[in-house]
From Swiss-Prot:
Name of protein: G-protein coupled receptor-associated protein LMBRD2
Transmembrane segments: 4-26, 32-52, 104-124, 142-162, 174-194, 368-388, 413-433, 454-474, 503-523
Cross-referenced InterPro entries: GPCR-associated_LMBR1, LMBR1-like_membr_prot
Composition bias, Low complexity: 582-597
Composition bias, Basic and acidic residues: 567-576, 603-612
Keyword Glycoprotein: yes
Organism phylogeny: Eukaryota, Metazoa, Ecdysozoa, Nematoda, Chromadorea
Family statement: Belongs to the LIMR family.
Biased composition (Polar residues): 624-644
Membrane topology classification: Multi-pass membrane protein
Residues bearing glycans: N73
Length: 644
């Protein structure tokens, strides 16, 4: 029965991973190897939500059995005392099954994060034209990183030898695992320092529509320059490639075929948007260095891939931000003027339910959820700062887990562990899914994420999987090599797999001191937004309240949204006039001559009506037709918190 329960939980994680991967990427357009590798990385990083609490509950069960057996062996009274039987926790599986599952999860994650995913990342961005050439380029690009990793491992190995550690196969494995997990722990500290603060803050601000609208205006203005720069870059590269292609009409070396491959990276939609007339003005000239070499074509191909990805990301973000601003404006207008918010019917959720959510429930729900996450943040922070104190149980996470096992039943520790690990994972992964690295990494929740970004996210998630488990077990005093607690007696299957982190003394003793200090320091930096103010003062655009530059960008963003609204309105009016003309023309062909003449007079009057008169009437009717001027659906209707 326990195996079936575990299989059901693994299937739930499978469905969740499939949903997230389909939400953030376009599976049909991706390389199948990229999709499969990313899916495995995401799956193994989410599987710990169910497997780790089960491991904790089974460990408490083994502790109960050991205590019961010790009581039976040490008692001398007759008759023997009645010792209650230890009840199996829900979803119990044998230790060897759990141990082998952890082995698959851990080593698969390590193989993906250190070898497969970095090579795939370089492979998809390589400019070579053959598979073998891309593989060679990927190996060369990663050679420097592997050399740095080798030097770090050599330094740790020399340090271990000076400390008297015997160098054998088992200790070498432990040293590699310890170094990898230590790097992952510090990465986890950085992500938690951001996520533990920004997750409650984002939920709180999500309930403030005025703040969200101003922030959206700011983001639109900030993105406008990046989008314009990306468009100009794509234009220049396309002109160069087109000139190069036209100059190779008599090519006999196969170079023209490679240039055609580069041209195929520019989709028809991109060309139509950048060159509406389909006429490329030749402002670029080939270099005077002779015929184009293979290296130049590879470099041009790589630049093309990078430029097109940058433009696609900017265009996708632009559409999402504009749709969000239009929706928030419509929502504010409907509330201030008493009109019902018009929503589309393209979802299975009834319109009345969605309207009630947006107008009545969203704000208080987000505020309450923000308060709950603030409490959980303090809970986690206090646990991080006190988990190494074992003389008294000061860690709230350890106290709650121990209280649930002694006061109620140890099987309830599975639910307590599930709640704590879910918030830890949410805080850390929240940062990964919101992180934006300039023109390199961005996860778009509308399926426009490029292959490089989706692979980089899988690298981060795989690298965080073991450290999150170690950190959680240390918080609840179930990892003696982290919390220095020696009295529990039973270790989890995950700890048995990991080996001893205290083989290298500096890794074992320093982690209890530096990890809490770093988390508190980073949380304070993010709470007071020190980084944002520093970047703002040196010239980078940052959203700072009550700042003149920020207000100017908000006003500029509002103007851009108004331009987009007018463009949508004109497009809708044009489509409506075309539809009316088509319907009238069809009815005139089916009717008599009088109907035809009536249509002509009506059509003539419509065509000859002055444009200013149309504008005046549109202004008068704009307040009652706001739903026709912009999208009538929230831009992320599939998830309420996608635009956090």
């Amino acid at each position: 029965m326990g195996t079936i329960s575990l299989a059901v939980q693994l299937f739930i994680v499978f469905l969740l991973t499939s949903y997230l991967l389909n939400k953030y990427s376009t599976i049909r357009k991706q390389n199948p190897i990229v999709t499969i590798s990313t899916f495995i990385g995401w799956y193994f990083s989410l599987i710990i939500v169910f497997v780790l609490p089960l491991d904790v509950a089974i460990t408490f069960f083994h502790k109960c059995e050991n205590d019961r057996q010790r009581i039976l062996n040490t008692t001398t009274s007759t008759p023997a005392p009645v010792v209650p039987e230890c009840e199996l926790p829900g979803g119990y599986v044998p230790d060897d099954v759990l141990f082998n599952l952890w082995r698959v999860v851990y080593w698969s994650a390590q193989l993906l994060t250190w070898l497969i995913l970095p090579l795939l990342q370089s492979y998809v961005t390589a400019g070579n034209f053959t598979i073998l050439g891309k593989i060679r380029a990927a190996v060369i690009n990663n050679a420097l990183y592997y050399a740095i990793y080798s030097l770090c491992f050599l330094a740790i190995l020399i340090y271990a030898m000076f400390k008297g550690v015997s160098i054998n196969i088992e200790n070498l494995k432990v040293i590699v695992v310890s170094a990898s997990n230590t790097w992952g722990l510090f990465l986890l500290v950085v992500l938690l320092g951001h996520g533990l603060v920004e997750l409650p803050r984002s939920l709180w601000h999500h309930g403030n529509r005025h703040y969200r609208l101003r922030k959206t205006y700011f983001d639109i203005e900030k993105l406008a320059s990046e989008k314009s720069e990306a468009e100009e870059n794509v234009k220049d590269i396309y002109k160069k490639v087109r000139v190069l292609f036209n100059s190779m009409k008599n090519d006999s070396n196969g170079q023209r075929r490679k240039v055609r491959t580069i041209l195929s990276k520019f989709s028809d939609d991109v060309i139509d948007n950048l060159f509406p007339s389909r006429q490329v003005i030749d402002n670029a000239h080939l270099d005077e260095s002779g015929p184009c070499s293979e290296a130049k074509l590879i470099s041009l191909h790589k630049k093309t891939i990078y430029a097109v990805q940058t433009l696609n990301n900017a265009t996708a973000q632009w559409k999402v931000l504009v749709d969000r601003a239009l929706f928030l404006e419509n929502l504010a207008f409907s509330e201030s003027n008493g009109y019902n918010l018009e929503l589309s019917r393209n979802t299975c959720v009834p319109i009345g339910v969605r309207r009630f959510w947006y107008t009545r429930l969203q704000t208080p729900f987000c505020r309450i959820l923000g308060i709950v996450t603030v409490f959980m943040t303090f809970f986690v922070l206090f646990s991080e700062c006190t988990f190494f104190v074992v003389s008294y149980t000061l860690s709230p996470a350890a106290f709650v887990t121990e209280y649930a096992s002694t006061r109620f039943h140890y099987k309830y520790t599975q639910f307590v562990a599930f709640g704590i690990i879910v918030y830890l994972i949410t805080s850390a992964y929240f940062t990964i899914f919101r992180l934006q690295i300039y023109k390199y990494y961005h996860l778009d929740p509308n399926g426009h994420t490029d292959e490089n970004s989706i692979l980089f996210s899988a690298i981060l998630l795989c690298r965080l999987t073991p450290p999150i488990c170690l950190n959680f077990l240390g918080m609840i005093h179930m990892d003696s090599h982290i919390s220095m607690a020696k009295s529990f007696g039973i270790e989890t299957q995950f700890t048995k797999l990991m080996g001893h982190l205290d083989v290298i003394p500096i890794l074992a003793k320093g982690i209890n001191i530096y990890l809490p200090i770093c988390i508190i320091l980073l949380c304070a930096i993010h709470y007071y937004r020190v980084g944002a103010y520093v970047l703002h003062n040196i010239g980078f655009d940052q959203f700072v309240e009550a700042d003149e530059m920020t207000n100017d960008m908000i006003n500029s963003g509002r103007s851009l949204v108004q331009i987009e609204r007018n463009s949508i309105k004109r497009s809708n009016d044009r489509s409506q006039r075309t539809q009316n003309w088509t319907n009238s023309f069809g009815s005139s062909n089916a009717g008599n001559g009088s109907t035809t003449s009536k249509f002509k007079r009506s059509n003539k009057n419509d065509e000859e009506r002055p444009m200013l008169e149309d504008d005046d009437e549109e202004v008068e009717e704009s307040s009652t037709r706001i739903s026709m001027m912009s999208p009538t659906e929230h831009p992320s209707s599939s998830g309420f918190f996608d635009d956090m």
